[in-house]
Every structure is written in structure tokens, then in C-alpha cells.
Amino acid sequence: MSVYVLIPAAGMGRRMGASVNKQYLPLGDRPVLSHTIALFDRHPGIDHIFVICPEAEFPLCRREVIDPYDFRKVRGLVAGGAERQDSVRNGLQACQAAEGDIVLIHDGARPLLPPALIEPTVAAAQQCGAAIVGVPVKDTIKLVTDGMIDSTPDRSLLWQAQTPQAFRFGLIRDAHAQALQQHHKGTDDASLIEWLGGRVAMIEGSYRNIKITTPEDLVLAQAFLDTPGDFQA
């Protein structure tokens, strides 16, 4: 069995207010995306990595992210699609894994994943077919319509989904193919498995595993990076 990692890094991140893809913004002394790739490149349980970004950014990605850090497991860059779901599907087509191989899909803008979470996520995907990392929500959640609260879900049942999300290759490949055929858009890759009636295991993750989306997130990520913790590769 081989373990593949797909890293979608095609989003411009308009909420960041930057003129470049947020994955190329500096975190410490190197780009955000290079931290993310390093987490998996250094992990002994990972075999192959594919980075998904706009084709027009291939030279930039190689120059700023791939070449300077001598990654050993990056097998190639994959052209992103119009939406994240399209980008992941392109990545699945590129990796050409076997049916029973495991594929982890991880946001390029999540550079602080604790490496210790990778092995249990892969193991759960081997056993169940699909597994994701997440954390219990801290705040009370409200369902709102037209500015008015409809209801308050039981917070003890709510988890915030993160990445990586891990799957048997054949399962997630077929889910994406059916979603394309039926014009179904999922909010994440695990939701495609749920849509088809499949079960997805939840692995408790870390609140440090943030997705860098806003300028405030970048400040918080830098603070985490400067603080010893379980996220360091």
C-alpha cells in the first residue's frame, strides 16, 4: 500500500487582501505552502505528494516553494480547476494510485498540522475507507435565516472539519466521478462520501491546525510557529 498526499493550493484568498495567492505569503522565513509540504515530505509514512495550483503559477511555485527546499516526495504539480472540487479531481487523476492505496487531501493553507495526526488518520482510512481530522466546536452555533435565529443545535454533537481528509483511493475517485456526473457540489471531500451514503471516521485534531484565510490568521499562525508545540515537523 502506498500513501499519497494531494495539496490543493489554487485559492487566491481574497479575504487575505493580498495580490498573490495566500500560499506564497511568508510565514517565518519561508512561504506558507513550503511549511505544508514539509510536514508530509518529512513523514516516513508518506510516499508521494502532488501539489495542485493554477497552471499559470507553475513557474512561481517551483521557484519559490519546490526548488529551494529540496523536497524528496513531490512528484509533480497539477493544474487546478475552476473550483476546489475540480482541482482535487484533477489531482486524483494525476496520482494514478491503486484501488487500495490511501490518499490524503490537505489544504495548502494549513501549515501547522501536528505530524502525529497523520498516522492515525491513515490507519482510520484503511479501516473505514474514509477519515477526517476535526475538533469539537468551542462556540455556540446558531442556524439563521434572513437575519433571524431559527434554532440552536446541540453543541456537543458539532465538530469543525479540518484537513487532512483521508480515503481509500478507489472510494474517493468514484465519489468525485459521480459528483461530476450528477453536478453535485460538496463542501469538502468527506461530504461526497456522506452524499453517497458512506461512513466517515472523525479523528480529533488540534486547534493549532488553522487554515490561513485572513490577515489575522497569518498573525496567529506566526505566533503558533514561534511557540514550541506538537505541530512542528
Swiss-Prot record:
The record marks R155, K211 as: Positions MEP for the nucleophilic attack. It comes from the Bacteria. The keyword Ribonucleoprotein does not apply. It catalyses: 2-C-methyl-D-erythritol 4-phosphate + CTP + H(+) = 4-CDP-2-C-methyl-D-erythritol + diphosphate. Pathway: Isoprenoid biosynthesis; isopentenyl diphosphate biosynthesis via DXP pathway; isopentenyl diphosphate from 1-deoxy-D-xylulose 5-phosphate: step 2/6. Its EC number is 2.7.7.60. This is 2-C-methyl-D-erythritol 4-phosphate cytidylyltransferase. The record marks R15, K22 as: Transition state stabilizer. Belongs to the IspD/TarI cytidylyltransferase family. IspD subfamily. The lineage of its organism: Bacteria, Pseudomonadati, Thermodesulfobacteriota, Desulfuromonadia, Desulfuromonadales. Keywords: Isoprene biosynthesis, Nucleotidyltransferase, Transferase. PROSITE patterns: ISPD. Catalyzes the formation of 4-diphosphocytidyl-2-C-methyl-D-erythritol from CTP and 2-C-methyl-D-erythritol 4-phosphate (MEP). GO terms for biological process: isopentenyl diphosphate biosynthetic process, methylerythritol 4-phosphate pathway. GO terms for molecular function: 2-C-methyl-D-erythritol 4-phosphate cytidylyltransferase activity. InterPro entries: IspD (IPR001228), IspD/TarI (IPR034683), IspD/TarI_cytidylyltransf_bact (IPR050088), ISPD_synthase_CS (IPR018294), Nucleotide-diphossugar_trans (IPR029044). The gene is ispD.
